[in-house]
């Protein structure tokens, strides 16, 4: 991780990789491995305006139950759709945000405040499936980082299925 701000980055890059193996004790035939990863780029355009590009994916091997497949949808990877809207053996997504972020100082709170416009797309794959269907969502929102200790955003997303308002909280531990 090499970013200028760990809560609301304006420049830098972050890599996230995870592997998990699950073996069901009462049924040895139900075991699977789950692999996920993403890369986040934060590209400054002009002062206070940056582009955030997040590309990631996940896949599962073995014999998982359907509810253990990777998901697509919601505030984490495909805004404009409800959370976990799509499931598949393999998932790929790309999230793009244009951000305007400025410092905020007041008697009540110091931190950062900003506006965001986004365009997300993603796809799931299942064995013996040939849809070629990519799902897209777009929208706008506001973000707030009170005292620079946590990151909240509220977005209004639009897709061909729904128009959800989504709230996210991110905090570094």
Q: Locations of the language-model features?
A:
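Outer-membrane beta-barrel "beta-signal"
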Residues: 142-144, 162-173
């Amino acid at each position: 991780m090499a970013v200028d701000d760990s809560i609301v980055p304006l420049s830098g890059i972050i890599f996230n990789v995870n592997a998990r193996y699950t073996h069901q004790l009462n049924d040895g035939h139900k075991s699977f491995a789950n692999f996920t990863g993403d890369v986040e780029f934060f590209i400054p355009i002009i002062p206070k305006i940056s582009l955030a590009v997040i590309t990631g994916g996940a896949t599962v091997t073995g014999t998982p139950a359907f509810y253990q497949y990777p998901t697509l949808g919601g505030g984490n990877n495909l805004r404009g759709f409800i959370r976990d809207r799509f499931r598949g053996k393999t998932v790929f997504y790309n999230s793009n945000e244009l951000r305007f972020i400025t410092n905020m100082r007041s008697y009540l709170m110091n931190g950062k405040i900003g506006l965001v416009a986004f365009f997300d797309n993603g796809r799931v794959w299942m064995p013996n499936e040939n849809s070629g269907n990519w799902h897209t969502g777009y929208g706008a929102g506001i973000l707030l980082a009170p005292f620079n200790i946590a990151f909240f955003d509220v977005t209004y997303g639009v897709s061909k299925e729904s128009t959800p308002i989504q709230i996210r909280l991110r905090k570094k531990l």
